[in-house]
Amino acid sequence: MALFQKKKYIKINPNRSIIEKQAEQPEVPDELFAKCPACKHTIYQKDLGKNKVCPNCDYNFRITAKERLAIVADKDSFVEMFTGIESKNPLDFPGYPEKLAATKARTGLDEAVITGTATIKGQKTALAIMDSTFIMASMGTVVGEKLTRLFEYATTEKLPIIVFTASGGARMQEGIMSLMQMAKTSAAVKRHSNAGLFYITVLTDPTTGGVTASFASLGDIILAEPQSLIGFAGRRVIEQTVRQTLPDDFQKAEFLLNHGFVDAIVKRTELRQKLALLLELHTEVENV
């Protein structure tokens, strides 16, 4: 008989106590709290309010087009236009139709921009709002077509136009057809300008690539939300090209303001009032 015979024990599931403790903990819905990317504070969703601004550091959370519409436009004043336009997948890019269908189902949007007319404190304007939840609001043929039609409508109806930009750039799945939208939208902006009409762009986080290099930079007045990322190429691409280290705040709205690329930085909570004032100041008054 072995002197040190191995004893047999009844094993208890080591995970059982952990599972029981987890079961006793109250379930907290994921949508109840949000973590601020800037100050890292955990914030009660209700404290963010409809403007989605961090109460600790004033960081502007990214919001959807519909959320922005509710903040800016007068209630029930928005009339959507140019819906139902669809991309035909000109390059037969594999998986693109399926990606579009899935994104439409998830977001409830037809495309990465909503277009139409609205009033802001009673001032009528054409309005376009890009939505970064739709394939990062990349600009494809449909986005370009909707924006062009809106500018043409505003030109015909002699309306000012406000465009909220948010984009990762041109949509790679549509290749050269996507890049063409830069020239197409810019030409529509020029015709609107030649008619003596007013155009405001509001640059939000992020506004990059072909959108920055076209209609986003052509506003008569260019506003931006605080700390928004605004640029063309990515930071690393530029540093590797020029072989220099860029400033920490490079491509931030504040940096662009200091260098004359942005006219003003406006807090989201003050944006509606600012836009209404600008529209009022640039509205032609008859019989004066």
Curated annotation (Swiss-Prot):
The record lists Zn(2+) as bound by C36, C39, C54, C57
What cellular-component terms does GO give this entry? acetyl-CoA carboxylase complex
Q: What keyword terms does UniProt attach to this protein?
A: ATP-binding, Cytoplasm, Fatty acid biosynthesis, Fatty acid metabolism, Lipid biosynthesis, Lipid metabolism, Metal-binding, Nucleotide-binding, Transferase, Zinc, Zinc-finger
PROSITE patterns in the record: COA_CT_NTER
The residues covered by the CoA carboxyltransferase N-terminal domain are 32-288
The record, for Gene3D superfamilies, names: 2-enoyl-CoA Hydratase, Chain A, domain 1
Which cofactor is essential here? Zn(2+)
- Origin superkingdom: Bacteria
Checking InterPro entries in the record gives:
AcCoA_carboxyl_beta (IPR034733), Acetyl_CoA_COase_Trfase_b_su (IPR000438), ClpP/crotonase-like_dom_sf (IPR029045), COA_CT_N (IPR011762), Znf-ACC (IPR041010)
Name where it's found. Cytoplasm
Q: How is the cofactor bound?
A: Binds 1 zinc ion per subunit.
- Zinc finger (C4-type) residue ranges? 36-57
Q: Which reaction does it catalyse?
A: N(6)-carboxybiotinyl-L-lysyl-[protein] + acetyl-CoA = N(6)-biotinyl-L-lysyl-[protein] + malonyl-CoA
Gene Ontology BP annotations: fatty acid biosynthetic process; malonyl-CoA biosynthetic process
* Iron in keyword set: no
Q: What is its EC number?
A: 2.1.3.15
Sorted alphabetically, which PANTHER family does this protein's record hold? ACETYL-COENZYME A CARBOXYLASE CARBOXYL TRANSFERASE SUBUNIT BETA, CHLOROPLASTIC (PTHR42995:SF5)
Q: Which family does it belong to?
A: Belongs to the AccD/PCCB family.
Q: What protein am I looking at?
A: Acetyl-coenzyme A carboxylase carboxyl transferase subunit beta
| Species for this entry | Lactococcus lactis subsp. lactis (strain IL1403)
